[in-house]
Every structure is written in structure tokens, then in C-alpha cells.
Amino acid sequence: MNLSNHFLVAMPDMEDAFFSQSVVYICKHDEDGALGIAINKPSPITMDMIFSATGKNIPMRMQHDSVMMGGPVQVERGYVVHTPIGNWQSSIGVSDGIALTSSRDVLENISREGAVDKALISIGYSSWSKGQLERELADNAWLTVPADEHILFDIPYEHRYAAAFAKLGIDPLALFSGAGHA
């Protein structure tokens, strides 16, 4: 099972302080573990702070976007999920058209026409060790659904959790993750 380019959608009763009502975009999943970016948790960092560090202006298309809190790991670093993939110093391809980049060069070029079409900027990331995500899935902590670029890039972050459930065709209020466990 490879969940790269999928959303993890937290079950409604998840109690973890960070992951409660989270949608995590899985960027890499293999036998060694998984890495993803939470796409619906705003961070205290502003776009002004990010772009002033690069000496570039915030692109008009991103002026009202929030910087996401991608996860609790390496919160001092920035990560960009973007299209097209491009040729950056430190990127991993997630799908045919989406990449995760952690190098500054993508931020420095984001306002250049044609360099980056769509982008979600985050600080930190989420990770799971070998077998950990599979155990959490078996414990009914998460639902999975193939990623949707519209949810990832176009829908306001506060609506992404509901949109991911809608893509699954499920009403989150009707779910109880403890079903089937004695």
C-alpha cells in the first residue's frame, strides 16, 4: 500500500492535539515510513514573514493565503507543496504534477511568472516511522482518499476537512472510529 498523493483524514474522535480534525497530504510513503503536510492547520507565521526573508513580494494570488503548520517535525523549516514540479535544489515528486520542496530557491522564484503555478506553504511536516501509519490506519485513526488538487490548493483551509469527507461521501458526524473493537 502506497499512500503517496493521498489525503489522511483524521477520524472525528481523534484526540491528538495537533492532528484532531486534520487533513494531511501524504508526500512520501514507502517501507521506511511516511511524510506529509497538514493542509488545514494555520501557523502563526505570515506570508509577509516568509516573503520578507526572501526579499521578494508576496504574489498577488497568495496574498490572502495562510502559512500552514505542516506538522510537529522541524517547525523551524519551510516546505512548499507546488505545481508544476520544476527543477529545485531539494524536491521530491509526489505525483506527475506535484512536488514537495524544502529548498529556498522555490520561494525565491514563486513570484516569477510560470515558475510555480499553485503553492501551499507550510512550516514543519508530519512523519510516521516504519509501520506506524499502517498501525494507525488499522486502529481506525485515519481515513484515506486520493488527493484532490482543488482541495489541496483552491479551497480555503478551514473548509478542507469537510471537503475531504465530502470526497469520501461520508458525513463525519455519522462516524465512530471505535466500531468493531471490543
Curated annotation (Swiss-Prot):
Pfam families: DUF179. GO terms for cellular component: cytosol. Disulfide bonds: none annotated. It comes from the Bacteria. InterPro entries: AlgH-like. Coiled coil: none annotated. HAMAP family: UPF0301 (MF_00758). Belongs to the UPF0301 (AlgH) family. This is UPF0301 protein NGO_0569. It comes from Neisseria gonorrhoeae (strain ATCC 700825 / FA 1090).
